[in-house]
UniProtKB/Swiss-Prot annotation:
Homotetramer. SMART domains: IMPDH (SM01240). InterPro entries: Aldolase_TIM, GMP_reductase, GMPR, IMP_DH/GMP_Rdtase_CS, IMP_DH_GMPRt. Keywords: Metal-binding, NADP, Oxidoreductase, Potassium. This is GMP reductase. The active site is at C186. It is an enzyme of class 1 (oxidoreductase). CDD domains: IMPDH (cd00381). PROSITE patterns: IMP_DH_GMP_RED. Its EC number is 1.7.1.7. The lineage of its organism: Bacteria, Pseudomonadati, Pseudomonadota, Gammaproteobacteria, Enterobacterales. GO terms for biological process: purine nucleotide metabolic process.
Length: 347
């Protein structure tokens, strides 16, 4: 046993210090990034935000809607091959280039992902997702996927420390997914005591990944557009959003009605709700590590997407970054004990 004395920070414990700017308008900010990935050699350009691979967020409808904003969607792994075929048949190449195919690490997952990728060469992203990316089996699966799909861009996670980022990149991952426990419907930190404050995880993992020519995606912990800006400021190449995109028409959650008002269910993928839906229930040897919440219906996701992108542009203008790429170089974090004036929050 040992204790690390270094202070670790989350998004709510910092603000970004404003700096002199020559920008005249938020419209002057370029949010599009251009990437060439380490292992796949593929090039991609777009806004580096990803809708999370949750079945109440990462749906085909969400992918179609967010593609118009140049935003990626990690489509959840529970669609059948036949459903994928129908989606591909009805989608343009522009939509497909904004889609990630999500998978677990079982042999059945591998075979299903292979069938999906074979449906259309425009599917260039694979998202290998497990709750605990520290297992040897997971690393071996990433290496197996890289060997099987040498030209596909592989995103793999989740981890929160630099040495594991390095191992995954060396095993074939182009992008490492960073975050354990920060999600709005994740209870891993409560059930297990395991986790890492998200901003510090992003800063440390970005440093490790960039040293090897890899990239990271900050996954979880964002509740406002300002948090998205902080993640990019901390060095994230991509930011994945779940709760901020939940509850919309495209989100796919079940709608329930209480006292004449309609709500949409949103739950973590390790929650009892998710396990009952997809594997018949919670196995006797494990605990659920997610919760289910009821969200008021939020309408089309396009309004939320515009709000997020608008906040991100505004953050860039406050620090003088004319491009999103420059934001991390222009970011100085200050530690704070309050974020906002909350006097009217309950009204």
């Amino acid at each position: 046993m040992r204790i690390e004395e270094d202070l670790k920070l989350g998004f709510k414990e910092v603000l970004i210090r404003p700096k002199r700017s020559t920008l005249k308008s938020r419209s002057d900010v370029e949010l599009e990034r251009q990437f060439t990935f380490k292992h796949s050699g593929q090039s991609w350009s777009g806004v580096p935000i990803i809708a999370a691979n949750m079945d109440t967020v990462g749906t085909f409808s969400m992918a179609s809607a967010l593609a118009s904003f140049d935003i990626l969607t990690a489509v959840h792994k529970h669609y059948s091959v036949e459903e994928w075929q129908a989606f591909i048949n009805n989608s343009s190449a522009d939509v497909l280039k904004h889609v990630m195919v999500s998978t677990g690490t079982s042999d059945a997952d591998f075979e299903k992902t292979k069938q999906i990728l074979d449906l259309n060469p425009a599917l260039n992203f694979v998202c290998i997702d497990v709750a605990n990316g520290y297992s040897e089996h997971f690393v071996q699966f990433v290496a197996k996927a890289r060997e099987a799909w040498p030209t596909k861009t592989i995103c793999a996670g989740n981890v929160v420390t630099g040495e594991m980022c390095e191992e995954l990149i060396l095993s074939g991952a182009d992008i490492v997914k960073v975050g354990i426990g920060p999600g709005s419907v994740c209870t891993t930190r409560v059930k297990t005591g395991v986790g890492y404050p998200q901003l510090s995880a992003v800063i440390e993992c970005a440093d490790a990944a960039h040293g090897l020519g890899g990239m990271i995606v900050s996954d979880g912990g964002c509740t406002t557009p300002g948090d998205v800006a902080k993640a990019f400021g901390g060095g994230a190449d991509f930011v994945m959003l779940g709760g901020m995109l939940a509850g919309h028409e495209e989100s796919g959650g079940r709608i329930v009605e209480e006292n004449g008002e309609k709500f949409m269910l949103f739950y973590g993928m390790s929650s009892e709700s998710a396990m009952k839906r997809h594997v018949g229930g919670v196995a006797e040897y494990r605990a659920a590590e997610g919760k289910t919440v009821k969200l008021p219906l939020r309408g089309p996701v396009e309004n939320t997407a515009r709000d997020i992108l608008g906040g991100l542009r505004s953050a860039c203008t406050y620090v003088g970054a004319s491009r999103l790429k420059e934001l991390t170089k222009r970011t100085t974090f200050i530690r704070v004990q309050e974020q906002e004036n909350r006097i009217f929050n309950n009204l």
